[in-house]
Design a protein with these regions (language model features):
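Short helix-to-coil transition segments within interhelical loops
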Residues: 125-155, 195
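Loop-to-helix entry region at the N-terminal start of transmembrane alpha-helices
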Residues: 24-32, 77, 81-116, 201-206
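C-terminal transmembrane helix and the adjacent membrane-cytosol boundary/short C-terminal tail
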Residues: 50-56, 202-233
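Transmembrane alpha-helix signature in integral membrane proteins
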Residues: 22-53
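Cytoplasmic-entry segments and transmembrane alpha-helices of multi-pass inner-membrane transporters
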Residues: 50-87, 109, 114, 120-123
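Transmembrane alpha-helices
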Residues: 143-174
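Membrane-embedded alpha-helices of multi-pass transport/permease systems
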Residues: 42-47, 104-107, 111-133, 163-164, ...
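Non-cytoplasmic
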Residues: 162-211, 218-221
Length: 233
């Protein structure tokens, strides 16, 4: 069942139809971004770890595998999102049974963001002092312990900032997805604000997107601040 069919009855009694449309579209956008963030992290996070541990000098050095994986990631990152979404229509239809709607958009949003997550995780892990890794190895720590107990905790603030950037990017992607039937604030801004010349609706949609971005950035900054305060930095 599409998310819009579940949430529209909740807002249909609003006196102002514009408020009702904005509320539904905002929930659709949050729904798309929330799910695609989870799935892109599930896809991209382990790939980012693999990029680091299999590189030359890594704890699981596999140079050929690392090179091939890097090429694939770079190829996926180079695709414009609109084109990628169209190419993934068959996969969306296979997974959710449709190519239209917020749920269908989660598939290309997740796959489109996963390579960026992988590179963000890779960059964060590469910032970890190699001396810490060598010290852990000298004390007999297993590779999994080094990854999960040393490397990931050490780059926590950078990872949080990277995840925030990913979420904000997904908000922009979701707006683009709205132009080809995904719903959300992007769809509302195009269908009513642009095609029907209702400038006020477009402005309201943009304001809500800006608010969402500001809230997410503030939450991310607060999480990093709390972590650094806990560590005494």
């Amino acid at each position: 069942m599409e998310i819009s069919s579940l949430i529209e009855p909740l807002f249909k009694n609003f006196e102002n139809p514009i408020v009702s449309m904005l509320a539904v579209s905002t929930v659709e956008t949050i729904y798309m971004v929330f799910l695609s963030t989870i799935f892109s992290l599930l896809l991209g996070f382990p790939i980012g770890v693999l990029l680091v541990i299999t590189k030359e000098g890594g704890i699981y050095e596999m140079k050929k595998f690392n090179t091939i994986l890097g090429i694939i990631i770079n190829a996926l990152r180079s695709f414009p999102f609109i084109i990628l979404m169209i190419l993934l229509f068959p996969l969306s239809r296979f997974v959710v049974g449709s190519t239209i709607g917020a749920t269908a958009a989660v598939v290309p949003l997740s796959i489109g963001a996963a390579p960026f997550v992988a590179r963000i995780v890779e960059g964060a892990l590469l910032e970890v002092d190699h001396g810490l890794i060598e010290a852990s190895q000298s004390m007999g720590a297993s590779n999994s312990t080094i990854i999960f107990k040393v490397m990931l905790p050490e780059c926590y603030p950078t990872l949080v900032h990277g995840i925030v950037v990913t979420i904000i990017s997904l908000i922009g992607y979701s707006a683009m997805a709205g132009t080809i039937g995904a719903g959300g604030l992007g769809d509302l801004a195009i269908r009513f604000g642009y095609l029907r010349f209702k400038l006020d609706i477009m402005i309201y949609a943009i304001i809500i997107i800006i608010i969402l971005v500001q809230v997410i950035q503030s939450v991310g900054n607060y999480i990093v601040y709390r972590r650094q305060k806990k560590l005494g930095k």
